[in-house]
Regions:
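Short amphipathic alpha-helical segments
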Residues: 18-21, 43-45, 152-153
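Phosphate-binding core of ATP-grasp and ATP-grasp-like enzymes
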Residues: 140-150, 187-190
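ATP/NTP phosphate-donor binding region
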Residues: 1-8, 15, 19-20, 24, ...
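Gly/Ser/Thr-rich active-site loops/lids in small-molecule metabolic enzymes
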Residues: 96-104, 147-150, 156-176
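Short acidic/glycine-rich loop or secondary-structure boundary segments that cap or lie
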Residues: 86-88, 133-135, 146-151, 175-179
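Small/polar loops that bind or transfer phosphate-bearing groups
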Residues: 9-10, 33, 80, 171
Length: 213
């Protein structure tokens, strides 16, 4: 018998362990030691931790519960996303990440920029009794104020256990200059409601015209 499952790795490794535990109905505390490239999830808990401090917390700290999302039968503890740049995390080679760290993600994303921005997804989304629709270049449902290594100012008050997930949907635009301004606004917290949907909810349904990734 085990008292705790200890995970060393990045956001993806932790997510795989959470999925296994949820699907197999395993109820044990997870001790997480971040050892990946971005480690967004750990930053929401302790941004300045060290391996020694994480080990002390695992050995002597008190377990706590946090929100886990479910998307088409797959669980996520950090983020579920579609559209531009979402392939970057799994298309970036392990060798590149070892050499360049987070820069490997950035270079991969820049290399795929034209294809990413041309990936438009038309969909309806339903939340809190409201049905809306649009065509989007990017969408994310997250449980963290940081996504892809970037902190989102309008989600600064987000917590892991508030029963809500943060939703971000960015409209597809053919004008690259306008799209650049919109994305810059997302990064700085100055969002344009004409092009960006940003809200919190405990449940959201997406209805797409075609398979989306």
């Amino acid at each position: 018998e085990f008292e705790t499952i200890v995970v060393y790795g990045g956001d993806g490794t932790l997510n795989r362990v959470v999925n296994i535990m949820m699907h197999q109905d395993i109820h044990l505390p997870i001790g997480y030691i971040p050892g990946g490239t971005t480690n967004d999830f750990s930053k929401a808990i302790d941004e300045n931790g060290t391996i020694e401090s994480y080990c002390r917390t695992i050995a002597f700290g008190n377990p706590f519960s946090y929100d886990v999302g479910c998307f088409n039968g797959t669980y996520f503890n950090y983020v579920a996303a579609f559209g531009a740049f979402t392939a970057t995390s799994y298309e970036t080679s392990r060798e590149s990440k070892k050499i360049l760290g987070y820069g490997a993600y950035v270079l991969n994303a820049l290399g795929n920029l034209p294809a990413s921005l041309s990936n438009h997804t038309k969909m309806k989304f339903i939340h809190d009794g409201v049905e809306e629709e649009g065509t989007f270049v990017f969408g994310a449902i997250s449980n963290s104020p940081s996504v892809g290594g970037f902190k989102l100012p309008f989600y600064e008050d987000s917590t892991l256990d508030d029963g809500k997930f943060e939703v971000l949907l960015v409209a597809a635009l053919d004008n690259l200059e306008v799209l650049h301004n919109v994305l810059s606004g997302v990064a700085t917290g100055n969002i344009d409601p004409k092009y960006v949907h940003a809200f919190k909810t405990d449940k959201i349904e997406f209805i797409c015209e075609e398979d989306t990734a």
